[in-house]
Amino acid sequence: MARRATLLHRVRDGLPSDATLVQVAGPYEFLEPGDVQAPAGTAGPMAAALARLAPDVLCLAPEEAAMLSRSGLDLPQSAVVLSGAPQTRVVPRGGVRLGFVFFPMTGKPGAEPESKARAAVVTAAREMRGKADLVIGVSPWGSMAEEAFLTANPDAFDVLLGAGHGFGTPAMPQPVPRTLWARSHTKGKTIGRLDISLPVKKPDAPWLVGENHRAELLNPDYTVPGDPDIAILGDAPTVAAAPPPATTATP
């Protein structure tokens, strides 16, 4: 987490003065899907580091929330712990209303979501359209289920931040042109950065690389020095958000 903090500082320090940074920390940032506890001696430092990093949007799988609570972390009231039904939040930043739809958990990691769960997500996304300028999904379903969902519902979301089993990729307008689909690797292998130009595109307009967005995966590898304020907390493995934590909007 110390290396991740360094990368986030670099992103923040490199932004134009009129840009807004929104950090999103998603499910499976601390545990692999299916795990219930962190390696011995790491949960406490991870909880302390998370408290210092203080992401704008914090979304946790239920087992992660339980693990962090056992480690003494009081989750902020704004934290979202995924459940059996979609949850929503509107987060205003820099004059833009960010509408988040947090997908429900499946029966077990990697399992195909039930049709009822898929329909509930679509309904939540449609209801969010009238409340937000940008509708963002946060999913723990894994890459296969997410791709199938986007293909079947190409207009549901402007951005989908995916997590769980599967590959990592910077935000790309695939498999549908009007949704940016981003996936970071679990447990710290990458951090996703997404820069969105303002004004935000209309829902029926496609995403065009270099025109209305830019995206990349940042790698907190051994070449990145750890932030000393985080490193001093103890033996916490470097973890990166899945979905991406660094989202910027620039005019």
Predicted regions and their residues:
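Acidic, metal/ion-coordinating pockets
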Residues: 1-251
